[in-house]
Each structure stands twice: as C-alpha cells, then as structure tokens.
C-alpha cells in the first residue's frame, strides 16, 4: 500500500476522515461540557 500514496484515490478519503473526526469530536466536547455544567449546577 505504500506504493499508492502518491496515487489519487477514487473515493474522498479526506472528506470521510473529516466527517468521522468532527462527527465524534463535536458531540464529545458538547457532552463533556454538559457534564461540567451540571456539576456546577448541582452545587
């Protein structure tokens, strides 16, 4: 597979990786932010 690094791919691998990273990172940050907010609300 190392020989095909310079070859253009037929499928948008970078777009798929971007959607995968942001699709998981954004809800995770929002979820952690919500838990942190609830910790201050309870006190």
Swiss-Prot record:
Positions with a binding annotation for heme: 22
Keyword Disulfide bond listed: no
Major location category of this protein: plastid
UniProt remark on cofactor binding: With its partner (PsbE) binds heme. PSII binds additional chlorophylls, carotenoids and specific lipids.
GO biological process, one term: photosynthetic electron transport chain
Membrane-traversing stretches: 18-34
Matches recorded under Pfam families: Cytochrom_B559
GO molecular function ontology, one term from the record: electron transfer activity
InterPro entries recorded: PSII_cyt_b559_bsu, PSII_cyt_b559_CS, PSII_cyt_b559_N
Keyword terms: Chloroplast, Electron transport, Heme, Iron, Membrane, Metal-binding, Photosynthesis, Photosystem II, Plastid, Thylakoid, Transmembrane, Transmembrane helix, Transport
Cofactor(s) required for function per UniProt: heme b
Subcellular localization(s) per the UniProt record: Plastid, Chloroplast thylakoid membrane
Protein topology in the membrane: Single-pass membrane protein
GO cellular component: chloroplast thylakoid membrane; photosystem II reaction center
NCBIfam families: cyt_b559_beta
Subunit structure as annotated in this protein's UniProt entry: Heterodimer of an alpha subunit and a beta subunit. PSII is composed of 1 copy each of membrane proteins PsbA, PsbB, PsbC, PsbD, PsbE, PsbF, PsbH, PsbI, PsbJ, PsbK, PsbL, PsbM, PsbT, PsbX, PsbY, PsbZ, Psb30/Ycf12, at least 3 peripheral proteins of the oxygen-evolving complex and a large number of cofactors. It forms dimeric complexes.
Entry similarity comment: Belongs to the PsbE/PsbF family.
Function recorded in the entry: This b-type cytochrome is tightly associated with the reaction center of photosystem II (PSII). PSII is a light-driven water:plastoquinone oxidoreductase that uses light energy to abstract electrons from H(2)O, generating O(2) and a proton gradient subsequently used for ATP formation. It consists of a core antenna complex that captures photons, and an electron transfer chain that converts photonic excitation into a charge separation.
Protein name per Swiss-Prot or TrEMBL: Cytochrome b559 subunit beta
Organism: Thalassiosira pseudonana (Marine diatom)
